[in-house]
């Protein structure tokens, strides 16, 4: 068995069955079952769901949406990712799988916005997310680091 990796989840009935394993493990607000069912009904082929399989079973998952700031009062301008929900099955928690999912999202090199749910503020702090407070509520933001050593085409000419 190879090392687990993050992969985009297919929108199908197999994934729906895998999501049912998470029902009752976490908070209702983290449930993605209804979200997946809606995507199956709409025959949406662009899955917003990502997960980690271990031993053939889904053990961790997140939903990730591409958004564009349309004047909302927070620190992100332009295109960003909203990491809407992240959940790891209890048996596999505190083994780095949640961090693997977040690092996958970070690797896409867009700012990320997320809401800290279920006493997870320490997790987001550890992963260098910054807390942001606005009238609508609190959330966390991560910005990709600018590579100061990058050379543009104009500079190299």
UniProtKB/Swiss-Prot annotation:
Span of domain N-acetyltransferase: 9-146
Keyword check for Coiled coil: no
Keyword annotations: Acyltransferase, Transferase
Entry EC number(s): 2.3.1.-
Pfam family of the protein (one): Acetyltransf_1
Top EC class for this record: transferase
Record-level Gene Ontology MF annotations: acyltransferase activity, transferring groups other than amino-acyl groups
NCBIfam families in the record: PRK13688.1
Identification of the protein by name: Uncharacterized N-acetyltransferase BCAH187_A3974
Species this chain originates from: Bacillus cereus (strain AH187)
Organism lineage: Bacteria, Bacillati, Bacillota, Bacilli, Bacillales
């Amino acid at each position: 068995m190879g090392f687990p990796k993050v992969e985009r989840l297919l929108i199908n009935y197999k994934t729906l069955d895998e999501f049912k394993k998470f029902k009752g493990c976490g908070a209702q607000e983290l449930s993605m079952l209804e979200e997946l069912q809606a995507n199956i009904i709409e025959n949406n082929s662009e899955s917003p769901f990502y997960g980690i399989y271990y031993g053939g079973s889904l053990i961790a998952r997140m939903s990730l949406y591409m958004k564009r700031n349309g004047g909302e009062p927070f620190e992100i301008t332009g295109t960003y990712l909203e990491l809407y929900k992240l959940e790891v099955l209890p048996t596999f928690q505190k083994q780095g799988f949640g961090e693997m999912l977040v690092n996958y999202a970070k690797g896409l090199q867009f700012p990320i916005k997320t809401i800290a749910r279920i006493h997870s503020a320490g997790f987001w702090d550890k992963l260098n997310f910054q807390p942001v407070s606005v009238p609508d509520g609190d959330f966390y933001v991560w910005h990709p680091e600018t590579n100061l050593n990058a050379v543009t085409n104009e500079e190299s000419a």
